[in-house]
Amino acid sequence: MSQKTFGQALNEALTIAMEIDETVFIAGEGVGVSIHQDPNMATHGLLKKYGPGRVKDTPVSEAAIAGLAVGASCMGLRP
């Protein structure tokens, strides 16, 4: 069994979920920002691989993030 950081394991899980299901997307504060070059970050490389349509930066607003998630799930997407 290989050893991974928590961020690497989460990145692998997100990658698998996004490969299997095209309705899965990631939204959050700073998830697509280019400053996240550290390979141990959970969202490292996902913006480049899946594009801005599936990796979305959100404002620093929990209400906005919750609204995005509820609206997306009502439309059949999986935030």
Regions found by a protein language model. Give the residues of each.
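Thiamine diphosphate
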Residues: 1-79
